[in-house]
A protein has these predicted regions:
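Transmembrane helix-loop junctions in multi-pass membrane proteins
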Residues: 46-53, 81-85, 105-112
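Interfacial loop-to-transmembrane junctions
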Residues: 139-161
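Juxtamembrane boundary at the C-terminal end of a transmembrane helix
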Residues: 164-175
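Alpha-helical transmembrane segments of polytopic membrane proteins
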Residues: 1-4, 25-37, 58-73, 93-97, ...
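Hydrophobic alpha-helical transmembrane segments
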Residues: 4-12, 36-44, 65-76, 95-112
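N-terminal topogenic module of multi-pass integral membrane proteins
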Residues: 1-59
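Short alpha-helical packing/oligomerization segments
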Residues: 105-140
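C-terminal ends of transmembrane helices
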Residues: 11-20, 75-86, 138-144
């Protein structure tokens, strides 16, 4: 469902931010609502799954992952705003929020026995790579000319969508 959210977000971005052309407000609104609905459903399902899954081995406390995410967000907010003078937008919260949710989910899948330690580490590395790539795009966005900025806005969504499809495929394969 999070991959569907990324897909809806891609459509919205493509329509709403297409250079030199303004989409009808109703179309942009419908796509943004679809993105929000898919995102809320995905987060709800993932959180429910994380809480309802029985562990057969010990993982990292979800509280530690959440605390790390909060600290990471605050540090990145300060660095991006005060050091790089980049306007803080919702995307920073979404990047870090996705990473925290993804890491908690990988941890739950490890603790449940569905993912091995190796697969779990691979998904943690994939999550880190997507976050680094997304943060790079986030930081350079306002310094790009309009067409490059338009493409730059797509990249984090594509990376998240692919990562979520890979994780869904791994879960189905392991089941």
């Amino acid at each position: 469902m999070l991959a569907a959210c990324a897909g809806c977000y891609l459509l919205w971005w493509g329509v709403a931010f297409y250079p030199d052309r303004h989409a009808p407000l109703w179309l942009s609104g419908i796509l943004l609502v679809a993105t929000a609905v898919c995102g809320i459903m995905a987060v709800n399902w993932m959180v429910q799954g994380n809480f309802q899954t029985e562990g057969i081995r010990k993982g990292v406390s979800g509280g530690w992952i959440l605390a790390g995410g909060v600290i990471c967000y605050i540090v990145l907010l300060v660095i991006s705003n005060l050091v790089f003078h980049r306007m803080v937008t919702t995307e920073l919260f979404l990047i870090i929020g996705w990473a925290v949710l993804n890491l908690v989910t990988v941890n739950t899948l490890y603790a449940s026995g569905l993912f091995s330690a190796g697969i779990s580490v691979a998904f943690c590395v994939l999550t880190l790579a997507v976050v680094i790539g997304s943060l790079y795009c986030y930081m350079i966005y306002y310094n790009l000319e309009k067409w490059k900025g338009y493409i730059d806005g797509f990249l984090p969504l594509v990376m998240v969508g692919i990562a979520m499809l890979i994780m869904a495929g791994a879960m189905l394969y392991k089941k």
